[in-house]
């Protein structure tokens, strides 16, 4: 049985968050509910999770020496990555020295870039995926596109939220797509993946939890993407029993191969009864923010419960629910939100992330809604998000 200490006391159970965005903030809050001492880390000050942590630090998390020095200073019981852009070699070394990395350092290393996880899924586990090629320079990139065929998709092997991604329809787009991919990688210029276009009816995120009492699944989450980033998500996504069983089988294989305890966001394409693996994040997923209103245990609560070695038991899904992002475009280091009364009502909630600044378009919050049907919940969430006025 897991023993939890008390924050700010000698017995404290300490969790170090590597990445302190909106997802990390919710993880920090769930840790706080259990009296856990939270140390939030990011590359910039006043990040969302830092605002609800006991302590915070600003470092370059791609600097392995700086990361190891901070871990030696804080001596956390759990190191919890929230983003991909981390010195994963340092995590592997720390784990070998006895530190607990959530879910495992291997999972963090394999999923920090698309090459590691794609090779695991397609080549080691034999799971169905899109056709793909990797390229390290422009000549290899053009060759990969020729092999895959048009249209195709190019992504930096290490990026998130759609950064550096392009949908290539013609050869005239190749040069600009290559340059955009080189600018959008989280660790700078480098290798890309070229993917064939998959025919699918919809995409899902299957939140899969590996815990002391086994593997658990949340109801499938549907979502709409725009410019590579999610705009709305909803739960449950309707799908055939055959497809759901296949999705769960794929997700369980991936999660068990990565190892460790925690929640994983497994992304899948669904076409009829067929299911194709896309990606996996070994941590809460942005599309899973809908679970803040759709389940008795949110994805964040499930992640914390799992990595602490506590049983999940069961997950209750309340019915149709949706999330819609609040995505303004402006420049300010003093953001204010207005017209909130028009955004709230029965079955409506808001989460405003507390990001310290914005320069361009940035996700600053999310509206959450329940409804009679999924379509009703989506419409209510979108209307709530649209009602929020954001000013600098």
Curated annotation (Swiss-Prot):
It catalyses: N(1)-(5-phospho-beta-D-ribosyl)glycinamide + formate + ATP = N(2)-formyl-N(1)-(5-phospho-beta-D-ribosyl)glycinamide + ADP + phosphate + H(+). ATP binds at residues 114, 155, 160-165, 195-198, 203. Its EC number is 6.3.1.21. Mg(2+) binds at residues 267, 279. One of its GO terms (molecular function) is magnesium ion binding. It comes from the Bacteria. Pathway: Purine metabolism; IMP biosynthesis via de novo pathway; N(2)-formyl-N(1)-(5-phospho-D-ribosyl)glycinamide from N(1)-(5-phospho-D-ribosyl)glycinamide (formate route): step 1/1. One of its GO terms (cellular component) is cytosol. It holds the Pfam family RS_preATP-grasp-like. N(1)-(5-phospho-beta-D-ribosyl)glycinamide binds at residues 22-23, 82, 286, 355, 362-363. GO terms for biological process: 'de novo' IMP biosynthetic process. InterPro entries: ATP-grasp, ATP-grasp_carboxylate-amine, ATP_grasp_subdomain_1, PreATP-grasp_dom_sf, PurT, PurT/PurK_preATP-grasp, PurT_C, Rudment_hybrid_motif. Keywords: ATP-binding, Ligase, Magnesium, Metal-binding, Nucleotide-binding, Purine biosynthesis. The keyword Transmembrane helix does not apply. Residues 119-308 form the ATP-grasp domain. Coiled coil: none annotated. Involved in the de novo purine biosynthesis. Catalyzes the transfer of formate to 5-phospho-ribosyl-glycinamide (GAR), producing 5-phospho-ribosyl-N-formylglycinamide (FGAR). Formate is provided by PurU via hydrolysis of 10-formyl-tetrahydrofolate. Belongs to the PurK/PurT family. PANTHER family: FORMATE-DEPENDENT PHOSPHORIBOSYLGLYCINAMIDE FORMYLTRANSFERASE (PTHR43055:SF1). Homodimer. This is Formate-dependent phosphoribosylglycinamide formyltransferase. It comes from Cronobacter sakazakii (strain ATCC BAA-894).
């Amino acid at each position: 049985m897991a023993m939890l200490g008390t924050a700010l006391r000698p017995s404290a159970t300490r969790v170090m968050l590597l990445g302190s965005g909106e997802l990390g903030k919710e993880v920090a809050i769930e840790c706080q509910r259990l009296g856990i001492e939270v140390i939030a880390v990011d590359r910039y000050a006043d990040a969302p999770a830092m605002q609800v942590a006991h302590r915070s630090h600003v470092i370059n998390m791609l600097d392995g020496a700086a990361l190891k020095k901070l871990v030696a200073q804080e001596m956390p019981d759990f190191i919890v990555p929230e983003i991909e852009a981390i010195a994963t070699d340092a995590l592997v070394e720390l784990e070998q020295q006895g530190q607990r990395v959530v879910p495992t350092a291997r999972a963090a290393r394999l999923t920090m870039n698309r090459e590691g996880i794609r090779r695991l899924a397609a080549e080691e586990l034999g799971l169905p995926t899109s056709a793909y090629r990797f390229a390290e320079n422009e000549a290899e990139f053009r060759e990969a596109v020729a092999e895959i065929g048009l249209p195709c998709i190019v992504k930096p092997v290490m990026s998130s939220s759609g950064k550096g991604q392009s949908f290539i329809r013609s050869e005239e787009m190749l040069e600009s797509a290559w340059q955009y991919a080189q600018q959008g990688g989280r660790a700078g210029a480098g290798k890309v993946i070229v993917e064939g276009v998959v025919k699918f009816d919809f995409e899902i995120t299957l939140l899969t939890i590996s815990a002391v009492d086994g593997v658990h699944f949340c109801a499938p989450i549907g979502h709409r993407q725009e410019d590579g980033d999610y705009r709305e998500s909803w739960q449950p996504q309707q799908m055939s029993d055959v497809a759901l069983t296949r999705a769960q089988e794929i997700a369980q294989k991936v999660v068990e191969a990565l190892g460790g305890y925690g929640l994983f966001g497994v992304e899948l394409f669904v076409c009829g009864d067929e299911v194709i693996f896309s990606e996996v994040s070994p941590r809460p997923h942005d599309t899973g923010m809908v679970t803040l209103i759709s389940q008795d245990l949110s994805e964040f609560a499930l992640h914390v419960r799992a990595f602490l070695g506590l049983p999940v038991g069961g997950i209750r899904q309340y019915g149709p629910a949706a999330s819609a992002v609040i995505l303004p475009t402006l420049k300010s280091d003093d953001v204010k939100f207005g017209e909130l009364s028009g955004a709230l009502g029965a079955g409506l909630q808001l989460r405003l992330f507390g990001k310290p600044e914005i320069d361009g378009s940035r996700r600053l919050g999310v509206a959450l809604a329940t409804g009679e049907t999924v379509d009703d919940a989506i419409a209510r969430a979108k209307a709530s998000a649209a009602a929020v006025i954001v000013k600098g």
